Structures are given as structure tokens and as C-alpha cells.
């Protein structure tokens, strides 16, 4: 999975897909009551990027629904995963539940259309800190109450704050979640980062019977050398400001027979087992 990073304006969606991304990450900004208002990162953000691009959250969902609905004139078959970078760290933890209800409801109304020809992409809920775990509970509760639990099959969870992996597992256990789990490791592209925690996450992913990580990705990679380093370690995905650079690296002899771009037929919740 090549994840385009910080794709917050509607016109950027096709821009990043044209560069080779098959997944996009966008920031979801909340008001003080936990209502999702905009796709917006704000200042500061990654080096060399404009931090202020935004869209109204529901309008953004309407657009990506079209892009991921077969038969729609805007359909792009390559876009298979939407990662919502939920800016919950900007609101009080006690509002995390309200935020989960709101995001689930807006996805039902604007993306899935409650079963009426909605978008088909998989959804990854990126949660900054384990203390905001009530968001997940609220999201699942809302799908259940609204009678649309079928969408759980499309939804995964990912804690992105580089917290202790065992602490993350404990929170997932508390929530009763042991599938559809991704693990991100990374830092803003402005700073270097070692591979110690990334290696630990990959080790857990590859431990037979370990359920709490099915995919691991590194973010936000801009240098080809760091992309190569991550691929050598065996990541499932790379988040980048420059998807075209990832595409180029994947074509190199060292990687071209080991990796390929994920398509809609690839299940993002299953561990990859090499043949």
C-alpha cells in the first residue's frame, strides 16, 4: 500500500492517485464538541508541504465515495484504502466517544450511503493515542445501533502515536478487538527516525498466533534510501508525500519480484504469508 500523505483538499485526491498512490491519508479536524468539521492538518506540518489545505469533511467524503464507487464517472479502481488521521489529540479525551459517533454517522450518510451504492474502499481509523480508545467503542456502537454492522468488515484500527506496543495490545484487548489491526511507526518527514520500534512491530506481526498486528507501515518517508530500508525490513505499506518515488523504488530489481501494489482483491486485514 502506497499511502499518499495529508491529502486534505478535494483536488489533491486525483493528484496523489496520478502519482501512484493506491491509498490516501487525510486529517479529520474536530470542533470542541467532537464534531468532525474539516479535512485539515494546520501548522506545523511536514517540511515542504502546504499545511493549510482543507475541505468540509462531509463534502470530502462525498467526493471520495464517487472515486471509489464502480460505475461512477469519477471512479478510480486503484484507490482501495482511506486512512482517516483523526485529530483527537486536539480535543479533550472525554469527547472521544462523541467524535466516534459523529464520524461513524457521517461515513454512513456520506460514504456508505447506508447500503445504497456507497464507496467500496477499506477504511483505516488512525487514532493518535491509546487514551482516545473510546472513539473505537463509539464507532462500533453507532454501526450496531444504526443496523449497519456489515461495515465492520471494511474498517480497521491503527494507533499512530508510537506508543508502547504492549500498551496498545492491552487497550485492544480491553475493547475486545483482535482483528483488522494495523500498526504505524514513524515521524514527520522533517526528522530522521531509527528502526527499533518498527522492527519490534514487524516481529510481533510475524509471530504465529499474534493477533494484534496484521499490517505494519512506515511514515512519512520522502527519501528513497529510507523507503528501501523500510522495504528491506518487510513493511506492508509506506506513507509518503511523494508516491511516485515509492513507485520508482518498487521497480528496482531488488524489490520488483518481492513487492507489488495492493489491489481491491487484497484483504488489508490479513497477514501476508509469502509463498
UniProtKB/Swiss-Prot annotation:
Q: Report where it is expressed, by tissue.
A: Expressed by the venom gland.
Residues recorded as binding Mg(2+), renumbered to this chain, are 25, 27, 85
Q: Which domain of life is it from?
A: Eukaryota
- What does the note accompanying the cofactor annotation read? Binds 1 Mg(2+) ion per subunit.
GO MF annotations in UniProt:
lyase activity; metal ion binding; phosphoric diester hydrolase activity; toxin activity
Reactions catalysed: an N-(acyl)-sphingosylphosphocholine = an N-(acyl)-sphingosyl-1,3-cyclic phosphate + choline; an N-(acyl)-sphingosylphosphoethanolamine = an N-(acyl)-sphingosyl-1,3-cyclic phosphate + ethanolamine; a 1-acyl-sn-glycero-3-phosphocholine = a 1-acyl-sn-glycero-2,3-cyclic phosphate + choline; a 1-acyl-sn-glycero-3-phosphoethanolamine = a 1-acyl-sn-glycero-2,3-cyclic phosphate + ethanolamine
The EC number on file is: 4.6.1.-
Main localization of the protein? secreted
Keywords attached to this entry: Cytolysis, Dermonecrotic toxin, Disulfide bond, Hemolysis, Lipid degradation, Lipid metabolism, Lyase, Magnesium, Metal-binding, Secreted, Toxin
The family database entries (InterPro entries) matched by this protein are listed as:
PLC-like_Pdiesterase_TIM-brl
For the biological process aspect of GO, one term held by this record is: lipid catabolic process
Location relative to the cell: Secreted
Q: List the disulfide bonds.
A: 45-51, 47-190
Cellular component GO terms, alphabetical: extracellular region
Protein family: Belongs to the arthropod phospholipase D family. Class II subfamily.
Described by its record, this protein's role is as follows: Dermonecrotic toxins cleave the phosphodiester linkage between the phosphate and headgroup of certain phospholipids (sphingolipid and lysolipid substrates), forming an alcohol (often choline) and a cyclic phosphate. This toxin acts on sphingomyelin (SM). It may also act on ceramide phosphoethanolamine (CPE), lysophosphatidylcholine (LPC) and lysophosphatidylethanolamine (LPE), but not on lysophosphatidylserine (LPS), and lysophosphatidylglycerol (LPG). It acts by transphosphatidylation, releasing exclusively cyclic phosphate products as second products.
Q: What is this protein called?
A: Dermonecrotic toxin SpeSicTox-betaIIA2v
The record lists the organism as: Sicarius peruensis (Six-eyed sand spider)
